[in-house]
Amino acid sequence: MKLILTADVENLGVAGDIVEVKDGYGRNLLLPRGLAIVATRGAEKQIEGIKRAQEAREIRDLDHAREVKAQLEALEGVSVAVRTSEKGKLFGSVKAEDVAAAVKKAGGPNLDKRSIELPKSLVKATGAYKVNVKLHSDIAATVNFEVVAA
């Protein structure tokens, strides 16, 4: 089945890509969730126009992403305050939205929680951590933050 992606799909492609997928994957997952549309000649022409406009925007976005990266890497004193037990273990874990709020509170830019890549092992103890923030397809920044007891 030939589809045009309307959103970025991990391990498949980015919005605007024309992809060939198995019928069941397209019919049962991509189409119902609005992640893709069926590829027709009219849709392909429309996507070409959208891609041209997107390329112009991407150049501006790339410059903005570089500025945000510089801000994030110069940022210090990012701390997430959470409730902990007497032994220093957290009640729950630190989520991407907690990190985004801490960056904003420390004077950094607004971050989308989906762009923050937390470590595979969840943050469940106090201490210093690093996370990657994907700002653009080509640019990622590293943010250092500390989890402290509230």
Swiss-Prot record:
Query: Entry's NCBIfam families?
Result: L9
Originating species: Corynebacterium diphtheriae (strain ATCC 700971 / NCTC 13129 / Biotype gravis)
Name the HAMAP family on file: Ribosomal_bL9
Protein name per its UniProtKB record: Large ribosomal subunit protein bL9
Pfam families in the cross-refs: Ribosomal_L9_C, Ribosomal_L9_N
Keyword RNA-binding carried by entry: yes
Q: Name one GO biological process term.
A: translation
Q: Tell me the keywords, alphabetical order.
A: Ribonucleoprotein, Ribosomal protein, RNA-binding, rRNA-binding
Q: Which family does it belong to?
A: Belongs to the bacterial ribosomal protein bL9 family.
* GO CC term (a single one): ribosome
Q: Which GO terms describe its molecular function?
A: rRNA binding; structural constituent of ribosome
In the UniProt record, the signal sequence range is none
Q: What does this protein do?
A: Binds to the 23S rRNA.
Lineage here is: Bacteria, Bacillati, Actinomycetota, Actinomycetes, Mycobacteriales
SUPFAM superfamilies noted in UniProt: L9 N-domain-like, Ribosomal protein L9 C-domain
UniProt cross-references to InterPro entries, sorted A to Z: Ribosomal_bL9, Ribosomal_bL9/RNase_H1_N, Ribosomal_bL9_bac/chp, Ribosomal_bL9_C, Ribosomal_bL9_C_sf, Ribosomal_bL9_N, Ribosomal_bL9_N_sf
